[in-house]
């Protein structure tokens, strides 16, 4: 057994995984239990009181985290005319129409976000089989189908997180990196949870946010005591 495995085993022996942890304790334990050399992401899983089998209770939205998520975001923009220069100035890595579509078909996906102006959607929809499974299809709700290209690119670059529930009514997202200061993680978490609250379907009854678990890429998952959060 190597040193990292021994250290992780020792750490796990002192963690009660059935306990609801104070948010400060949760972050401290996640940082303490990180044994890998790379900068792990801090991920959140939220169990919601929704019926995912009913379309009117499914959630799909986005929010901009104040401290970003700790990595650079590559943006592809489908647009034309004057918007090409605007997209370039805003920092988009890939810009085009039919030419960009052909590039994606031949070379695959090497970007994190797709933004499109309404007039470009006729081209983007043809990429549904490529973009759809990766949750990259532009969407008006998410602000990725827009006439304000500059703002959409800025949001994507500065920490916009797009989320949707899975078939079990759970939302998964990244809210930061293990090297973030504790207050930065808490600020991101609070903004993310506020967005989740605003996205609550009117048809959802009973307890809405049932359970919150924070984890790292290769580390442990800890349940958070919601009474210690700014909910």
Swiss-Prot record:
GO terms for biological process: regulation of translation; translation. GO terms for cellular component: cytosolic large ribosomal subunit. SUPFAM superfamilies: Ribosomal protein L1. Keywords: Repressor, Ribonucleoprotein, Ribosomal protein, RNA-binding, rRNA-binding, Translation regulation, tRNA-binding. InterPro entries: Ribosom_uL1_bac-type, Ribosomal_uL1, Ribosomal_uL1-like, Ribosomal_uL1/biogenesis, Ribosomal_uL1_3-a/b-sand, Ribosomal_uL1_CS. GO terms for molecular function: rRNA binding; structural constituent of ribosome; tRNA binding. HAMAP family: Ribosomal_uL1_B. Part of the 50S ribosomal subunit. Belongs to the universal ribosomal protein uL1 family. NCBIfam families: rplA_bact (TIGR01169). Binds directly to 23S rRNA. The L1 stalk is quite mobile in the ribosome, and is involved in E site tRNA release. Protein L1 is also a translational repressor protein, it controls the translation of the L11 operon by binding to its mRNA. This is Large ribosomal subunit protein uL1. It comes from Buchnera aphidicola subsp. Acyrthosiphon pisum (strain Tuc7). The gene is rplA.
């Amino acid at each position: 057994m190597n040193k990292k495995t021994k250290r992780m085993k020792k750490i796990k022996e002192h963690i009660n995984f059935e306990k609801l942890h104070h948010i400060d304790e949760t972050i401290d334990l996640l940082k303490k239990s990180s044994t890998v050399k790379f900068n792990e992401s801090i991920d959140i899983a939220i169990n919601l009181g929704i019926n995912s089998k009913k379309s009117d209770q499914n959630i799909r939205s986005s929010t901009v985290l104040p401290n970003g998520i700790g990595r650079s975001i590559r943006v592809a923009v489908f647009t034309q005319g004057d918007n090409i220069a605007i997209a370039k100035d805003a920092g988009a890595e890939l810009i085009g129409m039919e030419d960009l579509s052909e590039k994606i078909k031949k070379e695959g996906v090497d970007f994190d976000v797709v933004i499109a102006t309404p007039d470009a959607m006729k081209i983007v929809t043809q990429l549904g089989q490529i973009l759809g499974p990766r949750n990259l299809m532009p969407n008006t709700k998410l602000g990725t189908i827009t006439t304000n290209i500059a703002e959409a690119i800025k949001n994507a670059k500065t920490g916009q997180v797009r989320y949707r529930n899975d078939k079990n009514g759970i939302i998964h997202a990244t809210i930061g990196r293990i090297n973030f200061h504790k207050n930065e993680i808490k600020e991101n978490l609070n903004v993310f949870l506020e967005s989740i609250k605003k996205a609550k379907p009117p048809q959802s009854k009973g307890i809405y946010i049932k359970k919150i678990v924070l984890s790292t890429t290769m580390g442990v998952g800890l349940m958070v005591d919601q009474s210690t959060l700014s909910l």
